[in-house]
């Protein structure tokens, strides 16, 4: 599972 996806969602 791509963690960056979640991180970017939170950053955005």
UniProtKB/Swiss-Prot annotation:
Keywords attached to this entry: Glycoprotein, Hydrolase, Nucleotide metabolism
GO BP of this protein: nucleotide metabolic process
Activity profile over pH: Optimum pH is 6.5.
Record's catalysed reaction(s): adenosine + H2O + H(+) = inosine + NH4(+)
Needed cofactors: Zn(2+)
Activity regulation info: Inhibited by adenosine deaminase inhibitor 2-DCF, but not by adenosine deaminase 1 inhibitor EHNA.
Molecular function terms, GO-annotated: adenosine deaminase activity
Top-level taxon of origin: Eukaryota
Post-translational modifications reported in the UniProt record: N-glycosylated.
Cofactor binding comment, as recorded: Binds 1 zinc ion per subunit.
Keyword Disulfide bond attached: no
Keyword GTP-binding carried by entry: no
Enzyme Commission code: 3.5.4.4
Assembly and oligomerization: Homodimer.
Family, similarity comment: Belongs to the metallo-dependent hydrolases superfamily. Adenosine and AMP deaminases family.
Function comment: Catalyzes the hydrolytic deamination of adenosine and 2-deoxyadenosine. Plays an important role in purine metabolism and in adenosine homeostasis. Modulates signaling by extracellular adenosine, and so contributes indirectly to cellular signaling events.
Protein name: Adenosine deaminase 2
Source organism: Gallus gallus (Chicken)
Name of the gene encoding the protein in the UniProt record: ADA2
């Amino acid at each position: 599972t791509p963690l960056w996806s979640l991180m970017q969602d939170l950053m955005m």
